[in-house]
A protein has these predicted regions:
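N-terminal catalytic or cofactor-binding beta/alpha core of small enzyme domains
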Residues: 1-114, 119-124, 131-143, 147-159
Length: 159
């Protein structure tokens, strides 16, 4: 973890060529354009990689934004701590790309990361090839952005 105190990151995950799977990147880009905050670093990690684990170590708190398949209503946003993943989500697939949230959770435990990691997960409907969001995600996009922005202000920046 970083020697500097109160260091925060917001990280978008997803594949923008797989329709709803790109929702994490869409929300991240909106946040960058509308509410960039001091003390918060923003990163586009796309479909993620092991580099993400090393990036997480640099921050006290991190918010990951990602599309997920958790049996919720399409477009529904759920924000939770990564350590609570098994309590909040059901179903075999928590993420819609190769480096999923379950894998990240296992690596988080294995590497004994000290960062507090939150996940803003948005239920996907369609992850077929294409570059536009499904209608339910388009309809809920502004709500997801405003709730994510509110979470950043009230939780990450309340220290």
């Amino acid at each position: 973890m970083s020697n500097s105190s109160n260091k925060f990151a917001v990280i978008g995950l997803g594949n923008t060529l797989r329709r709803d799977d790109g929702i994490g990147i869409v929300i991240l880009e909106s946040l960058l354009n509308s509410c960039k905050r001091e003390r918060v670093d923003y990163f586009n990690f796309g479909i993620a990689s092991f580099d993400l684990i090393y990036k997480l170590r640099e921050y006290d708190s991190v918010l990951l934004i990602d599309g997920l398949d958790a049996g919720l209503a399409a477009g529904e946003l759920k924000i939770f701590e990564l350590k609570d993943i098994s309590y909040h989500l059901k179903g075999p697939a928590l993420s819609t790309h190769e480096f999923d949230l379950k894998s990240l959770f296992e690596l988080y435990k294995r590497f004994e990361l000290k960062s507090k990691i939150y996940v803003a997960g948005i239920q996907v409907q369609d992850v077929s090839f294409g570059d536009s969001l499904s209608q339910p995600l388009k309809d809920s996009l502004e709500h997801s952005i405003s709730e994510t922005r509110l979470f950043i202000d009230k939780t990450l920046l309340s220290f």
